[in-house]
A protein has these predicted regions:
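Terminal amphipathic alpha-helical/low-complexity segments used for targeting or macromolecular assembly
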Residues: 158-162
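Nucleotide and nucleotide-moiety/phosphate-recognizing core
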Residues: 1-120, 125-142, 150, 154-157
Length: 162
């Protein structure tokens, strides 16, 4: 699965790796962070649940369906995080921002939870409120999402994923 692929390649880059999910469907293979709002499928709920598990630290978040983000992009974001007081460091390419990839500081947990409780599930709103820092990338390919099974299959055929 994409989860296994992402975990295997990203684990060496971090002190710890956690999988955010609504329920344990991995049979104990991963350290999990379970979403705290049952029945609500939202990146804001997931982000709040994730950040509530950490204290005074940046947490790198990446959607499982973005398998082309590599160490190079992660390091570029981390370098900016080390130099700025901002609580969110997010990649941006020529087309758009990528809020499902980036470093979020754990101090954002209360704001993320508040927005989730208010049913405001747009990460862009959180990023606006916290004054996120955007890191520009010329190449958009690393931030491509595989939103459908056929996109995943096509990537396998093209050997984009190995």
């Amino acid at each position: 699965t994409l989860t296994h692929y992402q975990a295997a390649r990203l684990k060496p880059l971090f002190e710890s790796l956690h999988v955010s999910t609504k329920e344990d469907k991995f049979g104990g293979e991963f350290a999990l962070i379970l979403d705290k709002n049952d029945g609500v499928f939202s990146p804001m709920v997931a982000l709040a649940s994730i950040l509530e598990n950490f204290k005074d630290s940046y947490v790198f978040c990446l959607s499982v369906d973005a398998p082309f983000v590599e160490e190079e992009q992660i390091k570029a974001l981390w370098e900016v995080a080390q130099k700025t007081p901002n609580s969110a460091i997010i990649p941006r390419d020529l087309q758009t921002r990528h809020p499902l990839c980036g470093f979020y500081h754990s101090s954002l947990a209360p704001l993320a939870r508040q927005l989730a409780n208010e049913e405001n599930h747009k990460l862009g709103f959180l990023l606006q409120k916290c004054g996120a820092t955007y890191v520009d990338f010329k190449d958009s390919k690393p931030f491509t999402n595989l939103n459908h099974p056929h996109e995943y299959e096509e990537s396998l055929k093209n050997q984009s994923l190995v």
